[in-house]
Protein backbone atom coordinates (compact mmCIF):
# COMPACT_ATOMS: atom_id res chain seq x y z
CA UNK A 1 0.00 0.00 0.00
CA UNK A 2 1.29 3.45 -0.90
CA UNK A 3 2.17 5.63 2.07
CA UNK A 4 4.34 8.47 3.34
CA UNK A 5 5.91 9.68 6.55
CA UNK A 6 5.04 13.11 7.90
CA UNK A 7 8.64 14.34 7.59
CA UNK A 8 8.49 13.84 3.82
CA UNK A 9 6.45 17.00 3.34
CA UNK A 10 8.08 20.01 1.68
CA UNK A 11 6.85 23.59 1.58
CA UNK A 12 8.25 23.95 -1.96
CA UNK A 13 8.97 27.68 -1.76
CA UNK A 14 8.93 29.88 -4.88
CA UNK A 15 7.06 27.41 -7.05
CA UNK A 16 5.85 29.16 -10.18
CA UNK A 17 5.91 26.54 -12.94
CA UNK A 18 4.16 23.23 -13.38
CA UNK A 19 6.48 20.23 -13.42
CA UNK A 20 5.72 16.76 -14.77
CA UNK A 21 9.18 15.14 -14.84
CA UNK A 22 8.48 12.48 -12.21
CA UNK A 23 5.06 11.77 -13.67
CA UNK A 24 6.38 11.21 -17.19
CA UNK A 25 9.25 9.05 -15.93
CA UNK A 26 6.84 6.69 -14.17
CA UNK A 27 4.30 6.90 -16.99
CA UNK A 28 6.89 5.97 -19.63
CA UNK A 29 7.99 2.96 -17.56
CA UNK A 30 4.40 1.71 -17.52
CA UNK A 31 3.19 2.68 -21.01
CA UNK A 32 6.45 3.04 -22.98
CA UNK A 33 5.53 6.59 -23.96
CA UNK A 34 5.21 10.02 -22.40
CA UNK A 35 2.10 12.09 -21.99
CA UNK A 36 1.72 15.83 -22.26
CA UNK A 37 0.02 16.64 -18.94
CA UNK A 38 -0.57 20.19 -20.17
CA UNK A 39 -3.79 18.94 -21.71
CA UNK A 40 -5.62 20.79 -18.94
CA UNK A 41 -6.45 17.71 -16.89
CA UNK A 42 -4.63 18.96 -13.79
CA UNK A 43 -6.72 22.14 -13.65
CA UNK A 44 -9.90 20.24 -14.49
CA UNK A 45 -9.19 17.72 -11.73
CA UNK A 46 -8.37 20.48 -9.25
CA UNK A 47 -11.70 22.11 -9.99
CA UNK A 48 -14.00 19.08 -9.94
CA UNK A 49 -11.92 16.15 -8.69
CA UNK A 50 -11.66 14.52 -5.28
CA UNK A 51 -8.79 12.43 -3.93
CA UNK A 52 -9.65 10.55 -0.76
CA UNK A 53 -9.87 7.19 0.98
CA UNK A 54 -12.47 4.52 0.26
CA UNK A 55 -12.34 1.13 1.94
CA UNK A 56 -8.89 2.02 3.30
CA UNK A 57 -7.35 2.66 -0.12
CA UNK A 58 -6.83 5.93 -2.04
CA UNK A 59 -9.39 6.71 -4.72
CA UNK A 60 -9.68 9.58 -7.20
CA UNK A 61 -13.14 10.63 -8.41
CA UNK A 62 -13.96 13.26 -11.03
CA UNK A 63 -17.69 14.04 -11.33
CA UNK A 64 -19.23 15.75 -14.36
CA UNK A 65 -22.58 16.10 -16.10
CA UNK A 66 -20.74 15.91 -19.41
CA UNK A 67 -19.61 12.29 -19.77
CA UNK A 68 -17.84 12.90 -23.10
CA UNK A 69 -14.94 14.74 -21.50
CA UNK A 70 -14.52 11.97 -18.90
CA UNK A 71 -14.18 9.34 -21.61
CA UNK A 72 -11.61 11.55 -23.34
CA UNK A 73 -9.64 11.78 -20.09
CA UNK A 74 -9.76 8.00 -19.62
CA UNK A 75 -8.60 7.38 -23.18
CA UNK A 76 -5.82 9.95 -22.91
CA UNK A 77 -4.47 8.74 -19.57
CA UNK A 78 -4.95 5.04 -20.43
CA UNK A 79 -6.18 4.26 -16.93
CA UNK A 80 -9.28 4.62 -14.78
CA UNK A 81 -12.87 3.98 -15.78
CA UNK A 82 -16.10 5.94 -16.30
CA UNK A 83 -19.31 5.11 -14.48
CA UNK A 84 -22.54 6.71 -15.69
CA UNK A 85 -25.47 7.68 -13.48
CA UNK A 86 -28.84 9.27 -14.33
CA UNK A 87 -27.75 12.91 -14.37
CA UNK A 88 -23.97 12.75 -14.11
CA UNK A 89 -20.94 10.55 -14.70
CA UNK A 90 -17.75 9.80 -12.78
CA UNK A 91 -14.19 9.08 -13.82
CA UNK A 92 -12.75 6.81 -11.13
CA UNK A 93 -9.20 5.66 -10.40
CA UNK A 94 -8.58 3.03 -7.72
CA UNK A 95 -5.56 0.91 -8.63
CA UNK A 96 -2.29 1.53 -6.80
CA UNK A 97 -0.04 2.40 -9.75
CA UNK A 98 -2.53 4.81 -11.33
CA UNK A 99 -3.03 6.58 -8.00
CA UNK A 100 0.75 6.90 -7.78
CA UNK A 101 0.78 8.42 -11.27
CA UNK A 102 -1.89 10.91 -10.22
CA UNK A 103 0.11 11.77 -7.12
CA UNK A 104 3.10 12.78 -9.27
CA UNK A 105 0.80 14.58 -11.70
CA UNK A 106 -0.74 16.70 -8.93
CA UNK A 107 2.19 17.07 -6.53
CA UNK A 108 3.60 20.60 -6.80
CA UNK A 109 1.10 21.51 -9.52
CA UNK A 110 -1.97 22.44 -7.44
CA UNK A 111 -3.14 25.99 -6.71
CA UNK A 112 -5.69 25.39 -3.94
CA UNK A 113 -4.66 24.63 -0.37
CA UNK A 114 -7.64 22.38 0.37
CA UNK A 115 -6.84 20.25 -2.69
CA UNK A 116 -3.24 19.93 -1.50
CA UNK A 117 -4.62 18.88 1.89
CA UNK A 118 -6.60 16.13 0.14
CA UNK A 119 -3.35 14.93 -1.42
CA UNK A 120 -1.61 14.96 1.97
CA UNK A 121 -4.43 13.24 3.84
CA UNK A 122 -5.03 10.53 1.27
CA UNK A 123 -1.34 9.61 1.26
CA UNK A 124 -0.67 10.01 4.99
CA UNK A 125 -3.58 7.70 5.83
CA UNK A 126 -1.60 4.84 4.28
CA UNK A 127 0.76 3.24 6.75
CA UNK A 128 3.68 2.27 4.52
CA UNK A 129 6.11 4.42 2.56
CA UNK A 130 7.02 2.06 -0.26
CA UNK A 131 7.63 4.85 -2.76
CA UNK A 132 9.44 7.34 -0.49
CA UNK A 133 7.13 10.15 -1.57
CA UNK A 134 7.59 13.79 -0.64
CA UNK A 135 4.57 16.07 -0.77
CA UNK A 136 4.91 19.73 -1.80
CA UNK A 137 2.45 21.70 0.30
CA UNK A 138 3.02 25.18 -1.13
CA UNK A 139 0.43 26.09 -3.80
CA UNK A 140 1.90 26.69 -7.24
CA UNK A 141 1.63 30.27 -8.46
CA UNK A 142 -1.02 30.90 -11.06
CA UNK A 143 0.11 31.34 -14.65
CA UNK A 144 -1.84 31.25 -17.88
CA UNK A 145 -1.40 27.75 -19.27
CA UNK A 146 -3.58 24.77 -20.13
CA UNK A 147 -4.11 24.05 -16.45
CA UNK A 148 -6.21 27.19 -16.00
CA UNK A 149 -8.17 26.31 -19.14
CA UNK A 150 -9.01 22.96 -17.54
CA UNK A 151 -9.93 24.70 -14.30
CA UNK A 152 -12.33 26.92 -16.24
CA UNK A 153 -13.88 23.84 -17.85
CA UNK A 154 -14.66 22.70 -14.32
CA UNK A 155 -15.54 25.89 -12.47
CA UNK A 156 -15.85 28.78 -14.93
CA UNK A 157 -18.42 30.11 -17.37
CA UNK A 158 -19.18 32.87 -19.85
CA UNK A 159 -22.38 34.77 -19.24
CA UNK A 160 -24.41 37.41 -21.05
CA UNK A 161 -26.96 39.50 -19.16
CA UNK A 162 -29.48 41.72 -20.95
CA UNK A 163 -31.40 44.23 -18.85
CA UNK A 164 -35.16 43.98 -18.56
CA UNK A 165 -35.64 47.16 -20.58
CA UNK A 166 -33.51 45.65 -23.40
CA UNK A 167 -31.19 48.65 -23.39
CA UNK A 168 -28.20 47.37 -21.46
CA UNK A 169 -26.01 44.32 -21.94
CA UNK A 170 -23.25 42.90 -19.77
CA UNK A 171 -20.66 40.27 -20.73
CA UNK A 172 -19.10 38.35 -17.88
CA UNK A 173 -16.35 35.80 -17.37
CA UNK A 174 -16.99 34.03 -14.05
CA UNK A 175 -15.07 31.48 -11.99
CA UNK A 176 -16.37 30.04 -8.70
CA UNK A 177 -14.35 28.08 -6.16
CA UNK A 178 -14.38 27.11 -2.52
CA UNK A 179 -11.40 28.60 -0.65
CA UNK A 180 -10.51 30.38 -3.88
CA UNK A 181 -9.56 33.79 -2.46
CA UNK A 182 -5.79 33.44 -2.86
CA UNK A 183 -6.14 32.02 -6.37
CA UNK A 184 -8.53 34.77 -7.42
CA UNK A 185 -6.26 37.49 -6.05
CA UNK A 186 -3.53 36.14 -8.33
CA UNK A 187 -5.96 36.02 -11.24
CA UNK A 188 -6.98 39.61 -10.59
CA UNK A 189 -3.32 40.68 -10.63
CA UNK A 190 -2.63 38.85 -13.91
CA UNK A 191 -5.64 40.38 -15.66
CA UNK A 192 -5.34 43.74 -13.89
CA UNK A 193 -9.10 43.55 -13.66
CA UNK A 194 -11.97 41.67 -12.12
CA UNK A 195 -13.90 41.62 -8.86
CA UNK A 196 -13.93 39.02 -6.09
CA UNK A 197 -17.12 38.25 -4.19
CA UNK A 198 -17.42 36.27 -0.96
CA UNK A 199 -20.29 33.79 -1.04
CA UNK A 200 -21.65 31.20 1.38
CA UNK A 201 -19.56 28.45 3.00
CA UNK A 202 -16.20 30.04 2.18
CA UNK A 203 -16.94 30.03 -1.55
CA UNK A 204 -15.67 32.87 -3.72
CA UNK A 205 -16.53 34.20 -7.16
CA UNK A 206 -14.21 35.99 -9.55
CA UNK A 207 -15.85 38.00 -12.34
CA UNK A 208 -14.57 40.16 -15.19
CA UNK A 209 -17.18 42.51 -16.65
CA UNK A 210 -15.02 45.36 -17.98
CA UNK A 211 -15.48 45.17 -21.75
CA UNK A 212 -11.94 46.44 -22.38
CA UNK A 213 -10.36 43.83 -20.08
CA UNK A 214 -12.33 40.91 -21.50
CA UNK A 215 -10.02 40.94 -24.51
CA UNK A 216 -7.31 39.43 -22.28
CA UNK A 217 -9.67 36.58 -21.39
CA UNK A 218 -10.51 36.07 -25.06
CA UNK A 219 -6.84 36.03 -26.07
CA UNK A 220 -6.11 33.42 -23.41
CA UNK A 221 -8.86 31.01 -24.47
CA UNK A 222 -7.91 31.48 -28.11
CA UNK A 223 -4.50 30.09 -27.15
CA UNK A 224 -5.66 27.45 -24.64
CA UNK A 225 -8.80 25.84 -25.96
CA UNK A 226 -11.52 24.61 -23.62
CA UNK A 227 -12.41 20.91 -23.86
CA UNK A 228 -15.93 20.94 -22.45
CA UNK A 229 -19.05 22.32 -24.12
CA UNK A 230 -18.08 25.70 -22.65
CA UNK A 231 -15.92 25.99 -25.75
CA UNK A 232 -19.14 26.33 -27.74
CA UNK A 233 -20.12 29.26 -25.52
CA UNK A 234 -16.69 30.83 -26.00
CA UNK A 235 -16.94 30.46 -29.78
CA UNK A 236 -19.81 32.98 -29.69
CA UNK A 237 -17.17 35.60 -28.81
CA UNK A 238 -18.34 37.61 -31.81
CA UNK A 239 -20.81 39.02 -29.28
CA UNK A 240 -17.86 40.85 -27.72
CA UNK A 241 -17.19 42.77 -30.94
CA UNK A 242 -20.90 43.47 -31.33
CA UNK A 243 -21.04 45.11 -27.90
CA UNK A 244 -17.75 46.92 -28.50
CA UNK A 245 -19.25 48.34 -31.70
CA UNK A 246 -22.41 49.29 -29.77
CA UNK A 247 -24.67 47.20 -31.99
CA UNK A 248 -26.96 46.73 -28.99
CA UNK A 249 -27.95 50.37 -29.37
CA UNK A 250 -30.13 49.46 -32.37
CA UNK A 251 -33.24 47.28 -32.34
CA UNK A 252 -31.83 44.95 -34.99
CA UNK A 253 -28.52 44.69 -33.18
CA UNK A 254 -30.19 43.90 -29.86
CA UNK A 255 -32.24 41.10 -31.44
CA UNK A 256 -29.03 39.61 -32.82
CA UNK A 257 -27.41 39.84 -29.39
CA UNK A 258 -30.40 38.19 -27.73
CA UNK A 259 -29.99 35.17 -30.00
CA UNK A 260 -26.26 35.01 -29.31
CA UNK A 261 -26.76 35.45 -25.56
CA UNK A 262 -29.15 32.50 -25.47
CA UNK A 263 -26.53 30.30 -27.14
CA UNK A 264 -23.76 31.49 -24.82
CA UNK A 265 -25.76 30.96 -21.63
CA UNK A 266 -27.14 27.60 -22.83
CA UNK A 267 -23.68 26.11 -23.28
CA UNK A 268 -22.66 26.98 -19.73
CA UNK A 269 -25.22 24.72 -18.03
Regions found by a protein language model. Give the residues of each.
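Internal intein/HINT superfamily modules and their associated LAGLIDADG
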Residues: 1-269
